[in-house]
UniProtKB/Swiss-Prot annotation:
<comment type="similarity">
    <text>Belongs to the cornifelin family.</text>
</comment>
<keyword id="KW-0812">Transmembrane</keyword>
<keyword id="KW-1133">Transmembrane helix</keyword>
<keyword id="KW-0472">Membrane</keyword>
<dbReference type="Pfam" id="PF04749">
    <property type="entry name" value="PLAC8"/>
</dbReference>
<dbReference type="GO" id="GO:0016020">
    <property type="term" value="C:membrane"/>
</dbReference>
<protein>
    <recommendedName>
        <fullName>Cell number regulator 7</fullName>
    </recommendedName>
</protein>
<feature type="transmembrane region" description="Helical">
    <location>
        <begin position="80"/>
        <end position="102"/>
    </location>
</feature>
<dbReference type="InterPro" id="IPR006461">
    <property type="entry name" value="PLAC_motif_containing"/>
</dbReference>
Amino acid sequence: MYPAKPTVATASEPVTGMAAPPVTGIPISSPGPAVAASQWSSGLCACFDDCGLCCMTCWCPCVTFGRIAEVVDRGATSCAAAGAIYTLLACFTGFQCHWIYSCTYRSKMRAQLGLPDVGCCDCCVHFCCEPCALCQQYRELRARGLDPALGWDVNAQKAANNNAGAGMTMYPPTAQGMGR
């Protein structure tokens, strides 16, 4: 009635009579390599490390923000468009809500570069000290070999000319969606 010896499959002997279930669904690509955590290259209150940047950010924060946004968005948003949105938000809300827009780019940048919080959330940093936060982000991009003043296209071209980014930090490709 029962077999004398139970049948056990080993790694060299596949189990017969059992078919693997069919694979269905949408193929999912594996996520890219995890970004290693690193530290900010300068402090939040190190604005005077670059007096030119400090002055530009105090008098025209829309320019500083626009440059940062273009690089963080990898050219998907132009400096002019991001700066204009920042300025319109500042003007139409009485300089009360523009920091909400800029804090989203700080979060994107931290995620791309593996940077830690500076003790509080990104929105709190931008709400309490918008110019210092923008200066820190700008300095960080520069410290990683990206010059926001040049724009994304020139930075990407420089990376391509340096043997696919040797000595220069390149971001992983962006997730693309459908568009016109």
